[in-house]
């Protein structure tokens, strides 16, 4: 239920912050995403999307009796937890944000949440951090963290259902070696094996290589009717799929 009340949670947090001290007409939202780094191409759409939503709120005048909402950007980098923590700390202490849209990649999101946002009582709403470790079933997040993308635990089940519906009983798996990739690969393996499927290999891959032919050869030698890739399209995922198709190692 908590995840279904994301809009209410953010609005409540923003309202409490905005009206504290008599500042009922101004709201500042941090847009905390990987404007640089391995998912820069995705964030090129995500960031403006958040800002467009804010502009619609301002035009409607429906939030907090026509409060003016301002967006302030900060860069998670996706991969550098230290930089991400420094960035969200600036949003909170220097920019005085009332809420944060972000982070994006699971590792930096978790670090920013636990080490900076929670101690400062700051709400975060992530559009893309999917690690099962961020579910916080024991209220470790104190009710301050929400996400609009489903956990990898759910994604692993859906991937399994798709493959089983196609009669695919064995697959090779490769994943980008970070919290996101490993979390998704592990969730998929658990669900797929529970459904009777066989994982022939579950191996990490390095991001951003020019050539993945050796990785594809190793995956193919392990066998499997299909190849499952848990990774970023621009940082190896797409290249692995293309190399698999080009070599004929996997046809889908």
Language-model segments: which ranges?
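Short, low-complexity disordered leader/linker segments with a strong preference
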Residues: 1-28, 59
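Short, polar/charged alpha-helical segment
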Residues: 42-63, 187-193
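Short beta-strand segments enriched in small/hydrophobic residues
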Residues: 26-45, 104, 170-174
């Amino acid at each position: 239920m908590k995840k279904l009340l994301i809009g209410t949670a953010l609005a409540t947090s923003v309202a409490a912050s905005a009206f504290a001290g008599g500042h009922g007409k101004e709201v500042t939202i941090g847009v905390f995403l990987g404007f640089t780094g391995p998912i820069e191409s995705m964030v090129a759409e995500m960031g403006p999307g958040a800002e467009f939503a804010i502009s619609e709120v301002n035009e409607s005048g429906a939030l907090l009796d026509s409060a003016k909402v301002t967006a302030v950007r900060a860069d998670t980098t996706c991969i550098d937890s230290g930089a991400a923590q420094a960035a969200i700390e600036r949003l909170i202490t220097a920019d005085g944000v009332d809420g944060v849209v972000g982070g994006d990649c699971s590792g930096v999101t978790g670090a920013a949440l636990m080490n900076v946002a929670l101690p400062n009582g700051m709400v975060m709403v992530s559009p893309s951090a999917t690690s099962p470790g961020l579910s916080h079933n024991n209220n470790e997040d104190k009710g301050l963290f929400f996400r609009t993308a489903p956990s990898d635990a759910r994604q692993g089940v859906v991937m399994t259902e798709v493959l089983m519906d196609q009669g695919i009983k064995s697959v090779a798996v490769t994943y980008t070696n970070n919290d996101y990739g490993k979390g998704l690969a592990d969730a998929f393996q658990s669900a797929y094996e529970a459904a009777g499927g066989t994982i022939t290999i579950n191996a990490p891959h390095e991001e951003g290589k020019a050539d993945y032919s050796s990785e594809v050869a190793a995956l193919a030698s392990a066998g499997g009717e299909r190849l499952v890739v848990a990774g970023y399209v621009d940082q190896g995922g797409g290249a692995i799929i293309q190399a698999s198709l080009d070599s004929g190692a996997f046809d889908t």
